[in-house]
Design a protein with these regions (language model features):
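Bacterial N-terminal signal peptides that target proteins for export
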Residues: 1-11
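N-terminal signal peptide c-region/cleavage motif recognized by signal peptidases
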Residues: 19-21
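Extracytoplasmic small-molecule ligand-binding "clamshell" domains
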Residues: 25-97, 165-166, 254-255
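A ligand-binding cleft/hinge motif common to bilobed small-molecule-binding domains
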Residues: 74-75, 81, 89-99, 149, ...
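Short loop->beta-strand "edge-of-pocket" segments that line small-molecule binding or catalytic clefts
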Residues: 29-40, 124-145
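Extended ligand-binding regions for polar small-molecule ligands
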Residues: 47-60, 116-117, 126-141, 213-259
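Ligand-binding cleft/hinge of the Venus flytrap
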Residues: 53-63, 104-106, 126-130, 141-167, ...
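Periplasmic-binding protein-like
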Residues: 34-37, 106-110, 118, 198-241, ...
Length: 273
């Protein structure tokens, strides 16, 4: 309660402090997230991207809210560009439809192989892949990069496609564990998270080469993305990523995300457009 005996200067200082506190508390961070996409996010907020979003909001003193939407074709236009949400926690670095932060982790596709398998080392060019059943992820009826690379090598008949969205996310890893396929090529964060459920029965090996000529990548650096032109929020996010890098990597490790080193230039903060 205000005292009637406060001097005007003191009263003005208190009012400014209250106004600043109210402004910080009123800031809202609206995150676009998939409601059923573990280990990344879900509506129960148990994914690692949910955890990272909480860390960001806490650092910014913002109230975290979610706009739940499957990250399909057109979501940037409908949700980010139309200001229904402010931020996507995980997009490829330099994702053109958005203004992206510095990357905060880098991962790769991995081979998921039974630990007792005769396959000791494997690459996309391994002759022993011929005649095996090879699981690959299918996205919107299209192959992910591993499927495309295998098809280029004449291995179309060996490919077994898996929809890994929603409740089927674990299906491709489970198929390896249950010997329904001989091995699978899976995006690292998904593979690492679900492989742990099989208590050492599976091993993960990075896909080689990292880039399939002439230019099909198997490793990706991951950034946060905001609406183009929103440099203020992008810069705030980059400060959070730099300040809390070790905490973010701890979260990723907790979820079994296989990480690769970021290139030094990828960790340099840019303040431009």
């Amino acid at each position: 309660m205000f005292s009637p005996f406060l001097k005007p200067a003191a009263l003005a200082t208190i009012l400014l402090l209250i106004a600043g506190t109210a402004s910080a508390q009123s800031r809202e961070l609206r995150v676009c997230a998939d409601p059923d996409n573990m280990p990344f996010s879900n509506i129960q907020q148990r994914g690692f991207e949910n955890r990272i979003a909480e860390l960001v909001a806490r650092d910014l003193g913002a109230h975290l809210t979610y706009v739940w939407q499957r990250m399909g074709r057109g979501f940037v236009r409908e949700y980010i560009d139309k200001s229904q949400c402010d931020l996507v926690i995980g997009v490829p670095a330099n994702f053109r439809p958005l203004l992206t932060t510095i990357p905060y982790y880098r991962s790769s596709y991995v081979f998921v192989v039974p630990r007792q398998s005769n396959v000791k080392s494997v690459s996309l060019d391994s002759p022993e892949l011929h005649g095996l059943k090879i699981g690959v992820q299918v996205l919107d009826e299209n192959y992910t990069p591993p499927g495309t690379a295998l098809a280029r090598r004449g291995l179309q008949n060996e490919i077994v496609g898996f929809d890994t969205t929603g409740e089927d996310a674990e299906s491709i890893v489970r198929a390896v564990a249950k010997h329904q396929v001989d091995l699978a090529v899976v995006w690292g964060p998904l593979a690492g998270y679900f492989a742990r459920r099989y208590r050492g029965a599976l091993k993960l090996m990075p896909v080689e080469p990292e880039v399939d000529p002439p230019g099909l990548p198997f490793t990706f650096a991951i950034s946060m993305g905001v609406r183009k032109g929103n440099t203020a929020l992008r810069n705030d996010l980059q400060n959070v990523l730099s300040t809390h890098s070790s905490q973010i990597h701890d979260i990723l490790a907790e979820y079994g995300v296989p990480e690769l080193p970021l290139a030094p230039q990828q960790t340099s903060i840019s303040r431009g457009q």
